Structures are given as C-alpha cells and as structure tokens.
Design a protein with these regions (language model features):
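Beta-rich strand-turn-strand
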Residues: 42-48, 85-114
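N-terminal leader/pre-domain low-complexity segments
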Residues: 1-36, 55-59
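Core FKBP-type peptidyl-prolyl cis-trans isomerase
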Residues: 37, 43-68
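Well-ordered beta-strand positions in beta-sheet-rich domains
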Residues: 23, 81-83, 117-119
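Intrinsically disordered, low-complexity terminal tails
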Residues: 112-123
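Short structured motifs
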Residues: 20-23, 68-69, 80, 89-91
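An anionic, turn-rich surface loop/hairpin at beta-sheet edges
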Residues: 64-85
Length: 123
C-alpha cells in the first residue's frame, strides 16, 4: 500500500510541471467554429484564451488547496492546455463563455473581400 502511494506522489510531481490536454469538440457552425472544451475545476478568472498566427490556445489553471490535511488525495493542481489551428479567421469576432465546467469559444470565418476587376491603362 505504501509503495503505491510513493509512486502516485512521484507521478504527481512530474505531471504538475507539464501541461495536460483536455477533451474538446470543434464544431463547424453557420459562420465559423464553435469549440467546446472540458475544464472542470477551473475558475473563470484562471482561464486564458489567446490567438496568434492562426493558432487559438486555451489554458486553464486548476488549483487545489495544498494547505489541508488529506486522508487520501487524488486531485492535484495542474494546468490544462490545448491549441487549435484555425487558419484565417476574423480574430475580432472571437468570443468565449464558461459554464458548468465547459469553456465555449465562438470564432467567425473571415468575410471574403470581393475584389473588383481593375483595368490597367497602358502608357
């Protein structure tokens, strides 16, 4: 029994220093994408969403109180992180909400700019 606890604790030390992924769905909706990710245990203020060079990153820091005395402990503080390659989207349209342990991000496609035919004058 004690050996199992030792290995579980050692495993937890290594996992705390790295990012863990989380389960997510990416849906194609009428005008863009809807991304739904499971980040249960995170507080809204501990979730960061960034977009740069076509990559959307969602990161959630989940904190578990380390000051308590535990009889058994399986939950640990950790950082969840996922990246999504979305290509050319309207970055000003990105919106997010957090509800019941799910982060939901809405992203619109970039509107196509119709280019008019241009006649070139020959000099």
């Amino acid at each position: 029994m004690y050996i199992e606890d030792l290995f579980r604790d050692l495993d937890g030390l290594f996992k705390e220093r790295s990012y863990q992924g989380f389960k997510a769905d990416v849906l194609v909706i009428e005008n863009g994408y809807k991304i739904v990710g499971e980040v249960a245990g995170a507080k809204k203020e501990d979730i960061v969403i960034d977009y740069e060079d076509g990559i959307l990153t969602i990161e959630a820091n989940i904190k578990v109180d380390d000051q308590e005395q535990y009889l058994m402990r399986e939950r640990r503080s950790r950082t969840l992180r996922r990246t999504f390659s979305l290509g050319d989207i309207d970055e000003d349209s990105i919106k997010a909400k957090y509800e019941n342990g799910l982060i939901v991000v809405f992203v619109n496609f970039k509107e196509e700019v119709k280019k008019e035919k241009k006649n070139i004058i020959i000099e």
